[in-house]
Amino acid sequence: MIETFQAVLPHGITLSCRASGPAGAPVLLFLHGFPEAAFVWDELLEHFGTRYRCVAPNLRGFEQSSSPKEPEAYRVKHLMADVEALIAQVSPGGAPLEALVAHDWGGAVAWSFAVQRPQLLKRLVIVNSPHPATFLRELKNNPVQQAASAYMNFLCRPDAEALLAADDFRRMWPMFTNMGAADPARKGGGWLTPQVREQYRAVWGAGLTGGCNYYRASPLRPPTSPDDAIMKLEFAPEFVTVKVPTLVIWAEEDSALPPSLIDGLEAYIPALRLVRVPGATHWIVHEQPELVAGEIERALAA
């Protein structure tokens, strides 16, 4: 059974959360991406809730969580502060998480969190979220990735949220349907049911500025000229090396995040287990929750 609560954090942010499992049990924390919300983890919360306290916050800017208007409030350091404060609230005695599980933008936060706060988690699980070093490499050098990520520059437009909300979110649905979400003949397809559409309408109707601000605040987006700041950006190894055991689940038919993003990943993650999933798309959590749960089970047992 899924419960909901409001986590009021000491630095003035409130996160609306979904949870399952007994209070006092070891904690699994799940971070969603864009344009999703905490509800995408419900099947995993119920699966693991028999043994763990499972918590999935709506990140700042999503659903009923605090949604600051200024893009600067969505820099990773602020998002990490939310996660750290939430862990202090939900983890008994401040014990480290059994696992931090994250997808898409949640993964962008989780990569940095694992590097900078390794004492707060025992293991990291990433689902189709590019490591910052390989993402930077591909954005700078790979025309395929530059084209696949071109939407990021659109989402930085000052009118992006108005355009996305127009005509019953007409520009939003193709993010899902272009990867087979409404096609029951496709493996894992057909998950975008009328009920799920209503869940998304409710989330998006609460506001899209927060979600767009993640892109506005990020230095990682495709260059539009050779002089763009990203072309001069470099990451020192100590800022991108993950020292906790890490599972990366990578759906190979992700049209926004091609598999080239996992090439060379082992250079940044000494304790890496990589699971490639042919035929699955960016929305693998919707498509194949049993597979995702099974791989997380293996990681927890290791």
Each model region followed by its residue ranges:
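Short acidic-hydrophobic surface loop/beta-edge motif
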Residues: 3-10
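Conserved HGGG/HGGXW glycine-rich cap/lid loop of the alpha/beta-hydrolase fold
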Residues: 18-67
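A short loop-to-beta-strand scaffold at the N-terminal edge of the catalytic core in hydrolase folds
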Residues: 11-19
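Short, flexible hinge/linker loops that cap or flank conserved catalytic cores
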Residues: 9, 21-23, 48, 238-242
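Short active-site segment of divalent metal-dependent hydrolases/proteases
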Residues: 35, 106, 285
